[in-house]
């Protein structure tokens, strides 16, 4: 089967570090992502999807590429407007393919379809690649850091969109998962990727309240650790700290 990875994670650097701190600092990929992939016997990624160019989504790409064979990097066309990102891609010298709404990637018993962006953006939050897929009877929506503006565009383009599992946009921030979006997609489960005690205080209490009002089951990486979907004919959800 194919292995698809959406975003690598990465540390946002909030200023200059002393040299000894730089040397001792290890990436999130070295601490968690790479060991996990190796533990599952994964040494090859067929599609490395980078939703957008924020460091906390693609900052560990170079570290990952040194340890795992990446067959193809998938990005939005707007991401190519960021010079530092383009320089990184050239340095890695790996196959790169841009994705746009309507493209499909085969995975499991179905495919993941790109729903967004619908036009060329700038690689920022509202230019995030959004993927929708139906796998073993459940529907999933992965939204990167998409915020309200992008969610409204998505609703206008796909007025019948319904999903079972939502990967909440922008780490559960206040500016994403707006009420009209949540009411339309009718997701039963929200997955929130956020660092423990992060400085942004993600997820925002307002967003959590919206999920609660709609009786959604919420899984949070800051509280429960890794969230794993396992199964073949049906899904079982596990959390691993």
State each model region's role.
Residues 1-241:
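Non-globular, low-confidence helical/coil segments that flank catalytic cores
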């Amino acid at each position: 089967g194919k292995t698809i990875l959406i975003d690598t994670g990465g540390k946002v650097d909030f200023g200059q570090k002393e040299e000894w701190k730089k040397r001792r600092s290890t990436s999130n990929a070295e601490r968690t992502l790479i060991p996990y992939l190796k533990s599952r016997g994964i040494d090859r990624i067929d599609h490395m999807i980078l939703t957008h160019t924020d460091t906390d989504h693609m900052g560990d790409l170079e570290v990952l590429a040194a340890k795992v064979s990446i067959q193809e990097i998938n990005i939005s066309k707007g991401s190519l407007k960021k010079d530092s990102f383009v320089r990184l891609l050239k340095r890695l010298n790996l196959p790169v393919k841009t994705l746009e709404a309507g493209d499909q990637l085969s995975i499991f018993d179905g495919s993941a379809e790109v729903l967004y962006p619908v036009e060329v953006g700038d690689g920022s939050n509202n230019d995030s690649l959004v993927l929708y897929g139906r796998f073993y009877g459940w529907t999933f929506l992965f939204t990167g850091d998409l915020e309200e503006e992008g969610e409204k565009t998505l609703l206008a383009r796909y007025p019948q969109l319904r999903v079972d599992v939502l990967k909440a946009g922008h780490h559960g921030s206040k500016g994403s998962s707006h009420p009209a979006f949540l009411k339309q997609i009718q997701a039963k489960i929200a997955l929130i990727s956020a660092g423990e005690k992060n400085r942004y205080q993600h997820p925002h209490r307002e967003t959590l309240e919206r999920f609660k009002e709609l009786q959604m089951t919420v899984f949070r990486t800051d509280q429960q650790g890794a969230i794993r979907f396992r199964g073949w004919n049906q899904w079982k959800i596990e959390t691993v700290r």
